[in-house]
From Swiss-Prot:
This is Methyl-coenzyme M reductase I subunit alpha. The modification 5-methylarginine is found at residue 274. Coenzyme F430 binds at residue 150. It comes from the Archaea. Keywords: Cytoplasm, Metal-binding, Methanogenesis, Methylation, Nickel, Transferase. The keyword tRNA-binding does not apply.
Length: 553
């Protein structure tokens, strides 16, 4: 590839205002923290708030290591034109990132067929498209916090929960035609024809409700509350819509179906030492995250599809899960941003895509052998490392060894998965890249960064049921992955790459793919990077705000 065509050059020139090839630079000439408009804003805000805090000291960037001795870099969000400050990519400062997680956590999918069978077989009540529509109207009153069965019940202010609703989807085209379009997630309209047929075949004639519990519920309570909130309102809505007696025995079957038997949560329950219930980030399988991201519906570019999943996963797993839930700190942001800013991973991945197209014929064109893994991963890894050698500004951009290791290995893994259509081959491309990188630089990142990479190849084909799980079924709680940044989002992207290569409509669960194709969601899951950029530019309007119940401000 011509050096001047590197995708990351524009970003590097804007970040540093120097020739990216220049080997020498200056320090202590940038004005310290004052070079950053956002830091100046932080200081001004903190000074005003000290009095409100009763004089308790507050934010002071002069405490600790001197900030701004080097260039405080802005970041170009990859595949966009947005140039943003690093602070605005911290999830606490980015409403879009928060809503990305809110929209996942507040989602629960519930099968309707068990409840319909109870109605018809136990109670002798006919279920028709008309009664389903009546039920859907009822649940859209009850789910946000409206009362339906009892008097003297307090209710939730609608302006607090405007984002809450329920919809329905089915693989049965005849039934879908009869459902009120306000309540339907229309597979035929939202997916390309070939993908729609794959999904409908997988779903069959079954019918599912998607509950979007209020964002505010997830914030005040937790992910484990979501299915319970949904189930309670489902039960009340069935009682109301089908005029049932609240105390009869069959109601217990509705409760069991809505809370347990027919419930699909976005994340599995975690062990006690993680102290989290269902629908929390640590339980989201990589295949599930790949299905949550919707780029494959709207883009024919398999690299773009993969990179959007990487960005989503890096933000959720590295920034929120490991950086927040698990470590309790404010760091880890730059582990994630390395994968979705400045077009660097994009450049490495498109290089790999061009390589496999010329050598093997493109996506899903070669069997997943170790020779193939070694060839592709080595080629892409050496390309990436050569860029760090050639452009010192690139080295400064990815100032940490584990940033460079993660980005280079992600490109190697994605490319290998694209060529083979196999996620296991892809993750082995990642592992090999890490080992090659360590040979090249004698180190990667912090102590223990590459623990999982040293043993990963052997584990990837293990007979032990947890170690040998397909990449789609692994997640942040998989053995060796549980507390290590700079890996998990990339694994999710490698998962997507394999399925993009094969033209699959979904990676793991077609129900989740359909649920997040819903255009009524607050966050646009077709383009996570663009949404993160909107959040950084303060253009994104989130849900879950409390303005209706607090003084004007």
């Amino acid at each position: 590839m011509d050096a001047e065509k590197r995708l990351f050059l524009k970003a590097l020139k804007e970040k540093f205002e120097e020739d990216p090839r220049e080997k020498y630079t200056k320090f202590y000439v940038f004005g310290g923290w004052r070079q950053s408009a956002r830091k100046r804003e932080f200081v001004e805000a903190a000074q005003k708030l000290i009095e409100k805090r009763g004089g308790i000291p507050f934010y002071n960037p002069d405490i600790g290591v001197p900030l701004g001795q080097r260039k405080l870099m802005p970041y170009k969000v990859s595949n966009t034109d947005a140039i943003v400050e690093g602070d605005d990519l911290h999830f606490m400062n980015n409403a879009a990132m928060q809503q990305f997680w809110d929209d996942i956590r507040r989602t629960v999918i519930v099968g309707m067929d068990t409840a319909h069978a109870v109605l018809e077989k136990r109670l002798g009540v006919e279920v028709t498209p008309e009664t389903i529509n009546e039920y859907m109207e009822t649940i859209n009153h009850a789910l946000p916090g409206g009362a339906v069965v009892q008097e003297h019940m307090v209710e939730v202010h609608p302006a607090l929960v405007w984002d809450c609703y329920a919809k329905i989807f089915t693989g049965d085209d005849e039934l879908a035609d009869e459902i009120d379009k306000r309540f339907l997630i229309d597979i035929n309209k939202l997916f390309p024809e070939e993908q729609a047929e794959q999904i409908k075949k997988a779903i069959g004639k079954r019918t599912y409700q998607v509950s979007r519990v209020p964002t505010l519920v997830g914030r005040v309570c937790d992910g484990g509350t979501i299915a319970r909130w949904s189930a309670m309102q489902i039960g009340m809505s069935f009682i109301t819509a089908y005029k049932l007696c609240a105390g009869e025995a069959a109601i217990a079957d509705f409760s069991y179906a809505a809370k347990h038997a027919d419930v699909i949560q976005m994340a599995s329950f975690l062990p006690a030492r993680r102290a989290r219930g269902p629908n929390e980030p640590g339980g989201i399988f990589f295949g599930v995250l790949a299905d949550i991201v919707q780029t494959s519906r709207v883009s024919d570019d398999p690299v773009e599809q993969s990179l959007e999943v990487v960005a989503a996963g890096a933000m959720l797993y590295d920034q929120i899960w490991l950086g927040g839930y698990m470590s309790g700190g404010v760091g880890f942001t730059q582990y994630a941003t390395a994968t979705y800013t400045d077009d660097i991973l994009d450049d490495f991945s498109y290089y790999g895509y061009d390589y496999i197209t010329k050598k093997y014929g493109g996506c899903n064109s070669v069997k997943p052998t170790m020779d193939v893994v070694e060839d592709i991963a080595t080629e892409v890894t050496l390309y990436g490392l050569e860029q760090y050698d050639t452009f010192p500004a690139l080295l400064e951009d990815h100032f940490g060894g584990s940033q460079r290791a993660g980005v280079t290995a992600a490109a190697a893994g994605i490319t290998t998965a694209l060529a083979t259509g196999n996620s296991n081959a892809g993750v082995n491309g990642w592992y090999l890249s890490q080992i090659l990188h360590k040979e090249y630089h004698s180190r990667l990142g912090f102590y223990g960064y590459d623990l999982q990479d040293q043993c990963g190849a052997a584990n990837s084909l293990s007979f032990r049921n947890d170690e040998g799980s397909p990449l789609e079924l692994r997640g942040p709680n998989y053995p060796n992955y549980a507390m290590n940044v700079g890996h998990q989002g990339e694994y999710a992207g490698i998962t997507q790459a394999a399925h993009s290569a094969r033209g699959d409509a979904f990676a793991l669960n077609p129900l989740i793919k359909v649920a997040f194709a819903d255009p009524s969601l607050v966050f646009d899951f077709t383009h996570p990077r663009k949404e993160f950029a909107r959040g950084a530019l303060r253009e994104f309007e989130p849900a879950g705000e409390r303005d209706p119940i607090i003084p004007a401000h």
